[in-house]
Design a protein with these regions (language model features):
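Short, charge- and proline-biased low-complexity linear segments
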Residues: 15-25
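Residue-identity detector for glutamine
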Residues: 18-20, 51, 89, 100
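Short linear sequence signals and composition-biased patches located at protein termini or domain-edge surfaces
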Residues: 78-103
Length: 103
């Protein structure tokens, strides 16, 4: 769904990383722009997977995040060029060329 589309659209060297959200790890899509480096962060917060767009290096502000889906689960792994994202709805996979941070 949405997470896979954002990841696929930003698949470039150093674009996908693992961060730390308020309730566990976050999937971070890094986007360098002329005005600065921004991050789209996906993470679990109060029974929802949320999406937050912020300046890189800034703190997490879940109250400003947008709900992606209701879920008590959010996990992801990367192996052999494949990013697997798991929520209560199941697991979606995206083939990637690049991944940083050994997630």
């Amino acid at each position: 769904g949405l997470i896979c589309n954002v990841v696929r659209a930003n698949d470039s060297k150093g674009a996908i990383a693992q961060g730390q959200g308020p309730e566990g790890k976050s999937l971070v899509v890094v986007e360098p722009l002329d005005s600065g480096t921004y991050e789209t962060r996906f993470y679990l917060y109060e029974g929802k997977v949320v999406q937050e767009y912020s300046l890189a290096g800034s703190g997490y502000t879940p109250e400003k995040a947008t709900e992606v889906t209701a879920s008590d689960t959010f996990d992801f792994s990367y192996s052999n060029g494949l990013l697997a994202v798991t929520t209560d709805q199941g697991t979606a996979e995206v083939a990637l060329r690049y991944m940083q941070g050994g997630a």
